[in-house]
């Protein structure tokens, strides 16, 4: 089991307690259901997540952005998930509750402090680097040094496959989180379902199926929008088809990387147009709900004090050793910078000097410590 308990006092934050399972435990538990001797397998994780042993193959389904509370709220649109509603467990993702951090935690079993995957973007080379792409940055295996579960399986001559669109094959995130698995390109949900079934029927021991479209719809149109609901319903229908066609002996586990909330545009603060936040700040990175602040040399305490004064109860601000308490031990805290700003309520912080207008205008976002963002589902489907 991962050591993910957080002892910080952050009123209103939904953080894991000692012994609570995390996203870092999902693959370890799943592997134990097919062979507890596999590299990275954990019988303890399997037991904590309700995963029974005795399977011959493992199918891991990760639905980007479909947090536990969203499944509960929109269960009327998901007849397939509604049938297993009582079996869906609520566990925690990592901090920050965002794709780059969480999928890498899923793929390695380690929290962001160890993987350096600490947000959507990070300060790098005098600018800001997007961790999903890592364009112009180091090789993913250099930035993120922790071996993935898939690398460890490959070293033991156990094959694995990742089913996702072709555009993800060479991405920074794929290299950081999923390296070691063979990439199987498939575009639509039907194509991905068919590809996953082919891999299972061919005997591939571990198959990972990724669905990003619900998250994309949330970013573009908001949670609960027509587009978001259409994508949710499409996924549920595809899941039904997949489950009807599974070969015998497959353990199927579905989870997500994080949840999502709709922000209130009137509560978004722009660093570029707020002198008290802008002064003394070298670089702002991260994302709207989980902001990395890098102060000018020698000004960190002064800058943090001003940010606390300006933002007040609209954000949790964490600095020093407290950052590692949130994200896990390792070099990730240094990557975040002088302090981390995690939005409360439905607000956030942006910087129009480095962020595009479309990114700033996203109605659906994530990254912070609310239960809607932090709670993710785990359900054993077969």
Task: Set out the residue ranges of the language-model regions.
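Feature captures the catalytic ectodomains and active-site-proximal regions of enzymes
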Residues: 1-382
